[in-house]
Amino acid sequence: MPKKILFTGGGTVGHVTLNLILIPKFIKDGWEVHYIGDKNGIEHTEIEKSGLDVTFHAIATGKLRRYFSWQNLADVFKVALGLLQSLFIVAKLRPQALFSKGGFVSVPPVVAAKLLGKPVFIHESDRSMGLANKIAYKFATTVYTTFEQEDQLSKVKHLGAVTKVFKDANQIPESTQLEAVNEYFSRDLKTLLFIGGSAGAHVFNQFISDHPELKQRYNIINITGDPHLNELSSHLYRVDYVTDLYQPLMAMADLVVTRGGSNTLFELLAMAKLHLIVPLGKEASRGDQLENATYFEKRGYAKQLQEPDLTLHNFDQAMADLFEHQADYEATMLATKEIQSPDFFYDLLRADISSAIKEK
């Protein structure tokens, strides 16, 4: 009988990416892989799109809010139903372990696994834990963190960032699709790549639309999240979504303008790619992107610009400063010790799962 592992995590791409890196490794080693999530969530979309041999189990989900809302009352019942469904799934599958990447959908499966005596492993990407992982921590066997946590927590293992992105440009797959893009770009201009993520692309899209003069100063690549904006014209390439083209576009860019999600930031760090961070503010998030951006700026990896300050004048000043000190930023990024390979983390996770099973 094959070993089984349950994955959970969703709500944003960032809560799914690491799972999609780990899952093929478990499958290759003969594990039977299952995933608990929201059938209407991005986790289901990404699992389906991946084509991986994964059985998806849908549960009811309710959002965890830090503020009063009448929706909280309805969501209490959704979370309770999700917990009952998770208990049934875990009891039926009897997995060796559960791995959670966070997000509100992950809390019921984590609690269910703990109640049924299954080891629970959690990964936290941000500078501080989100509400879901703060709750899940109480039920976890081990929590792996990208950043060193300010609080000394007994279950925490500081790991560093896990990314499959690499620095060596010679290893980056060639893309014939980008040949057409290059025909519209000027070799005399710097190329900027704007990455807004699933929650933050709109501001970048609007900024580029409002300032057509940007195309006179730079080649612009804009990952929009909106197929209605798709365009290829002089010095401008707008595309709604990329998968295989993601890293070739990264390599093509001289500088990346990004939000403050930790997954993207550490990919840029792994590539030693010059970048400007425009983090989501507290009005649009819990403030984790502000913390991530400040951490990167203090380490000398990047420069940050707050969203209310995103004017053409301030943007041009930031570009000038980054390009003027490009060698310093790149040297600092190349010297980092904060990146781990997927194979390293997979081996660590497998060892920790084995240890947890033996201790039962």
Swiss-Prot record:
Example GO BP: cell division
Pathway the protein contributes to: Cell wall biogenesis; peptidoglycan biosynthesis
The UniProt record lists the keyword Repeat: no
UniProt: UDP-N-acetyl-alpha-D-glucosamine binding residues: 198, 289
InterPro entries given in the database record: GlcNAc_MurG, Glyco_trans_28_C, GlycoTrans_28_N
Subcellular location: Cell membrane
Top-level enzyme category: transferase
Annotated protein name in UniProt: UDP-N-acetylglucosamine--N-acetylmuramyl-(pentapeptide) pyrophosphoryl-undecaprenol N-acetylglucosamine transferase
Organism: Streptococcus pyogenes serotype M6 (strain ATCC BAA-946 / MGAS10394)
